[in-house]
Every structure is written in C-alpha cells, then in structure tokens.
Curated annotation (Swiss-Prot):
BP GO annotations: fructose catabolic process; protein phosphorylation
Highest taxon listed in the record's lineage: Eukaryota
GO molecular function, a single term: ATP binding
Modified residues (Phosphoserine): 60
GO cellular component term, pick one: cytosol
Keyword check for Aminoacyl-tRNA synthetase: no
Sorted UniProt keywords: Acetylation, ATP-binding, Cytoplasm, Kinase, Nucleotide-binding, Phosphoprotein, Transferase
Pfam families hit by this protein: DUF4147 (PF13660), MOFRL (PF05161)
Modified positions (N6-acetyllysine) in chain numbering: 200
Name the UniProt record assigns to this protein: Glycerate kinase
Protein localization: Cytoplasm
C-alpha cells in the first residue's frame, strides 16, 4: 500500500557550526559556487528558527527583573512562574527559556522524544541541554513518534502541575511539532490503547488529519484547549513553533491551549461516515454520551496568550533578506507548498523554464503557452498564498541573479523499497524536469531541505541539483529514472558526483517544514 514518506524525529544543530555539502572537491566549479550561496540561504533560514533566537525575540525582562514582557503583554514575576512543554524541539526551547528565566522558575515539566538528550550530548550541542540544577523535569517517550506509556506519564505530570496553579501564577507552555504524540491523556474510562486503536482504524479508512484531530480532541483531557482549562485561573503564555502549513493554532500538537470549535455531533458524524460508530468500545461511547457540549469551550481560554514564535514564513523571510544581501532579486513564492511530489516537481520544472525565458528574453518573446500551463498547474496544486504572477513580473524586470523561495511539505507515495526522503526525491525529480529542454544562457539551481536536518530515514537534510543533472548522471552511467521508480533518491545522490549534492546539516533543534530554493544566475 502506498504510504506518505514521513520525516523522522530529528533535532539540534549548533548555530555557529557551518553546514557541509558532502566530501571536499578538488576545485570549486561555478555550479558549486552557486550551491555554496544556496547553502548560506538555507543556513540563514534554519538559523532564524533556532530555539535561542526565537525565545530571545519573544521574551524579555524589565531592568528590575520583576516583569516579563511577551510581545506587547507584560506579566508580573514573583516566584510564580511555571513551565511545561511537549514536542520534538522543546528540549532546546526549554533550555533557552531556563537560561533567560531560570531564577524565577518554580517548577517545570517537559515531554520530549525518547533518546533526545543522549543524541544532543553526542552531537556536542550543550546549549540545548538543561543545566544540572534546573527546576525542569524531563520525561522521554513517544518512541517512533507514537504515544506510549512513558509519554502518558509525562502528560499526567504536566496535568498535575497545571491543576495546582492559582490565579497568581503564570504558566509558560512550549509547543512544537510532535507534541500531540508526547501529550497523550485520554479521558477515563478510555485507555491509551483504545484511543490508539480507534485512531488507526480511522486512518486506515482514509480519515483526514483534520478528522483524526477532531476525534483525538474529543477523547483527550489536554488537547483542544484542555491544558488551558486545567491551568485556569492561572495566566497561560503558549510559545509555539509551527510545523503545519498556515500555522493553524488548533492543529499544532492538537491545540492544547486553543479552544476546540468541534462538537460531539461532529465526532459522531465522522464515526458514522467511516462506519465505526457501532464498533466503538463502551468507554468511548461513555465519554461521548456525557459530553453534552464541547468541554474546552471558548470561554475557558480568555486567560491564554498564544504566540507563534517560529514558522516557515519567518524562516523564508530571513533567507530572502540574506539573498538580497548576496545581490539576488529575491521573492517568496509560497509557504504552503503541498501535494504529491511529482506534481510539485512538475511545477518547479515548468516555473524554471518560464522564469529563465523571462530573465533572458524580451517581453515579446515570453513563452505564453508555457505560462498558461504553469498557471493551470498552480491552480491544480491549490496553493492559497502563491505569488506566481508577481514572481514572474519581478523576474522579467530583474537585471541580475534571481532567487525564488518557497516552503511547505509535499508528500511522496511509496512505490519502491529504496531509501530517501521527500526533499531528496523532490530535488531528483526537479533535476529531471530541468533537463527536458535547454534553459538558455542561465545557470539554474534547485535546493530542497528539511529544516529539522533529517530527510526521511537518512542522515541528510535534502539535496540540490542543477539543470545539467540528467547529462551528468548519464556520464556516470546513473539512470535517475530507475532510482525514482524505486524511491531510492538517497542512493542516487550518494553515488552522483561523490555525494557532493547532498545537504549535510546535522541535527538542527528545530522544525518548520521544508525550504525550497530556485536560483537563476545569468551566464
């Protein structure tokens, strides 16, 4: 059965450590020089959403140290600060918060992926580890990004801390991607196993992520605003690192500090639609029957301040600024790139051909037929924030190199048994598209990298290609089509030109989905 490639939990890169692009090469070709600049842009995007800088931009203390400012809100500090967190990037976020606010912190509890502290220590990322005498207790769980008993114990500790708070207290909540699996708290008498079984049955029958989240929230004590309700009447400040397109607060980690807008009737409609209502465990029926209304209604979240402190759009904005410093005409195309990787690759390939023609030809010579195809493909991808026409106009007016940036999370349907990830597969497919016809007197480079530093079950973040990929691969007797058919992009890039096209970042400590760069440099 086809399944979407998933990015595995991965984290942590010291901001000062440079990215590496495979083994050293004897000489720096023009393509490698262009790739080095693209690397700098990717580096800047990831650096902008590192835990330390994010927290420092968001939190500040007044000179007396007795007031905490969060954006334009101020909170009094008087031995009343507590902290909880859950997610793949939360260990580094907690370390940064502890560094800034540790003297005011009474107690903290965080739930992080199994093995993360050992991985951080092994990588030498000491700045992302809590100090030995920190007041923050760390629970590791959710092995393979699945809720388990360890994560359940962490959720119970977080709930107990929240329920002890008073109106004089302030709770700082740290949230990142992966937080849902790290905060399992089914409403009794529903068990963790029963909730997981129901979720798996829904997924197997084709339920959407939105439908799955609706069911999860209805059966959870902490999701869908449940954590905010548990902490009431304390003030709650939730700092959120978004790994979801559009940054919907109710979706990230299933919205523990955001009031749910779904009712029990919505849940029953979903269960009926997938033919599961009659087969529900008695415990689930009990919970749904006694929930006459949404238990985490909007009236319970007036004491909460939710702040997105890191996102794909913030990362791309920084990369755009750095591109302009390097002399590029730079523009962000979209932060919502999604859909099947084949269609996304076709979009980028067609965009490259049209943009290259705009850059090197007069207005009268623009490829109108291909432009029409490009707009049609863009409409099929349904990218809500796509700035396509604006980008083409900017390219046509540009007098020098151009950099188009995008972000999001395409999906790969597995058909083979090879090794790779969505970023490497996208890069390889775009390389194939770029080789379909000459692009004129312009060098074109495409880069796709995961901001978490690990693309699928590999130790690289992604890869980059140029328009001569097909001819260069043929010269090395590499049939890229065979690698694509087997979803074996990692093996291809390891073999191609000594692995120099792989993007090695190491563990980054953050995740705001993927970054795509399409770079044009007139010859």
């Amino acid at each position: 059965m086809a399944a979407a490639l998933q990015v595995l939990p991965c984290l942590l890169r010291a901001p000062s450590r440079p990215f590496l692009w495979g083994p050293p090469v004897a000489r720096m070709t023009s393509g490698m020089a262009l790739a080095e600049q693209a690397r700098q842009l990717f580096d800047s995007a990831v650096g902008a959403v590192q835990p330390g800088p994010m927290l420092q931009r968001t939190l500040s203390l007044d000179p007396s140290g007795k007031q905490l400012k969060v954006r334009d809100r101020t909170f009094q500090l008087q031995e009343n600060l507590y902290l909880v967190g859950f997610g793949k990037a939360v260990l580094g976020m907690a370390a940064a918060a502890d560094e800034l606010l540790g003297q005011h912190l009474v107690q903290g509890v965080i739930s992080v992926p199994k093995g993360i502290r050992a991985a951080v220590e092994l990588a030498g990322k000491q700045e992302m580890l809590l100090k030995p005498h920190s007041h923050i207790q760390v629970f590791e769980g959710a092995e393979d990004n699945l809720p388990d008993r360890d994560a359940l114990r962490a959720a119970q500790a977080i709930q107990q801390l929240a329920e002890r708070l008073t109106a004089d207290d302030l709770l700082l909540v740290l949230i990142s991607g992966g937080g849902s699996a790290l905060l399992p708290a089914p409403i009794p008498p529903v068990t963790l196993e029963e909730k997981q079984t129901l979720t798996k049955l829904l997924a197997a029958r084709g339920a959407t992520i939105q439908e799955l989240n609706t069911i999860r929230k209805a059966l959870s004590q902490l999701k869908g605003g449940g954590l905010a309700q548990a902490a009431y009447p304390a003030q709650v400040v939730s700092l959120i690192l978004s790994d979801v397109i559009g940054d919907p607060l109710e979706v990230i980690a299933s919205g523990p500090t955001v009031a749910s807008t779904h009712s029990v009737q919505d849940c029953l409609h979903i269960l009926n639609h997938y033919g599961l209502r009659a087969a529900l465990p008695r415990s689930v029926k009990t919970v749904l029957s006694r929930a006459d209304s949404d238990p985490h209604g909007p009236h319970t979240c007036g004491h909460v301040l939710n702040v997105i402190i890191g996102s794909n759009s913030l990362a791309l904005a920084e990369a755009q600024r750095q591109a302009e410093v390097l002399g590029y005409h730079a523009m962000v195309l979209s932060t919502a790139m999604q859909g099947d990787v084949r269609r996304v690759a076709q979009f980028y390939g067609l965009l490259a051909r049209v943009a290259a023609a705009c850059l090197t030809s007069s207005t009268a010579e623009r490829p109108l037929e291909e432009e029409a195809k490009l707009h049609q493909l863009a409409a099929e991808l349904q990218l809500p924030d796509l700035q396509l026409e604006e980008a083409l106009e900017a390219v046509a007016k540009a007098k020098g190199p151009v950099c188009l940036l995008a972000g999001g999370e395409p999906t790969v349907q597995l058909q083979g048994s090879g090794k790779g990830g969505r970023n490497q597969e996208l890069a390889l497919r775009v390389g194939a598209e770029l080789g379909k016809q000459p692009l004129g007197p312009v060098d074109v480079l495409f880069l796709s990298g995961g901001t978490d530093g690990q693309d699928g079950p590999t130790k690289v973040a992604g890869a980059w290609v140029m328009s001569d990929l097909v001819s260069q691969a043929s010269a090395e007797n590499l049939d890229f089509a065979t690698f694509l058919d087997n979803n074996d992009s990692y093996t291809f890039f390891c073999s191609f030109q000594g692995g120099t096209h792989l993007l090695h970042t190491g563990l980054t400590g953050t995740n705001v989905m993927d970054v795509h760069l399409l770079v044009f440099h007139p010859q």
